[in-house]
């Protein structure tokens, strides 16, 4: 069995992979990326997206590959205007009123077929003991990008919109939820072993709104996927949820909970009795030196020893990260597995 699908309590094997493990910090990624000007075209290029998905597996021997794509591929495939500007990031047409639904299609216009082809091609080339992760953005996070027109930190436009336009906001949320469910189901049909739902902006919502716009749509997606693929594990990542992580665990039928670096280790240990926990080394640690990486990693590994646990970061690998530090971290986790001791090394 592929280890990442079965990170069992008391197992000596600690599954390890990283968010944004394929990306700008890798020289081999940059070499491929330079060949395509437009980022979305790059995401839809079957050969190039396949290659960069496999690069960190070749380099580090990680337990899982995650399909190279972006959470905004889905709205783009549904007809929404999405662009990526250099040194700015994603720029989208703003959703402002009911009439904007005319720009959203019920059909993905065959663009998503390219994603499914990438999955199939990666699957053919991936080592048999390496799991393949598919993903999508959560409805709230995708919706907030559409409402803001770009990524922001306070999301006041999005929150103002959902307060003032409750029915329209729910219509948009439900549309994205339905399409996200279909998208993830088709990813499993194409060959992924498990799924991840990225909710990058869940932490900006108060409790009632968190329930309505994060918990409820996530539940709907999971239940719909599980109707078709009951055994496919699903990772959820309501980043920045803080105290609401516990409400999320209680109300969402999750298999694996990814947590950010702000979550205390004691909470991770406690929650691992209910779900598999994934996390949560601060990505900034990988910008430091080997001694600091070793110290911080050891603390997490000791706390989660014998627990239902997947080692990962609290967010994605940063672009300025040295690949050698990622290599060191991976080897250190492997060494910890071998030693499986309380002593430092």
UniProtKB/Swiss-Prot annotation:
GO cellular component, one term: cytosol
EC number(s) stated in the UniProt entry for this protein: 4.1.1.37
SUPFAM superfamilies according to UniProt: UROD/MetE-like
Main location: cytoplasm
Pfam families registered for this protein in UniProt: URO-D
Primary enzyme class: lyase
Compartments in which it is found: Cytoplasm
GO molecular function: uroporphyrinogen decarboxylase activity
Gene Ontology BP terms: protoporphyrinogen IX biosynthetic process
Keywords, sorted A to Z: Cytoplasm, Decarboxylase, Lyase, Porphyrin biosynthesis
InterPro entries given in the database record: UROD/MetE-like_sf, Uroporphyrinogen_deCO2ase_HemE, Uroporphyrinogen_deCOase
Biochemical pathway: Porphyrin-containing compound metabolism; protoporphyrin-IX biosynthesis; coproporphyrinogen-III from 5-aminolevulinate: step 4/4
Catalytic activity: uroporphyrinogen III + 4 H(+) = coproporphyrinogen III + 4 CO2
Function according to Swiss-Prot or TrEMBL: Catalyzes the decarboxylation of four acetate groups of uroporphyrinogen-III to yield coproporphyrinogen-III.
HAMAP family assigned to the protein according to its UniProt record, in alphabetical order: URO_D
Name this protein carries in UniProt: Uroporphyrinogen decarboxylase
Classification of source organism: Bacteria, Pseudomonadati, Pseudomonadota, Alphaproteobacteria, Rickettsiales
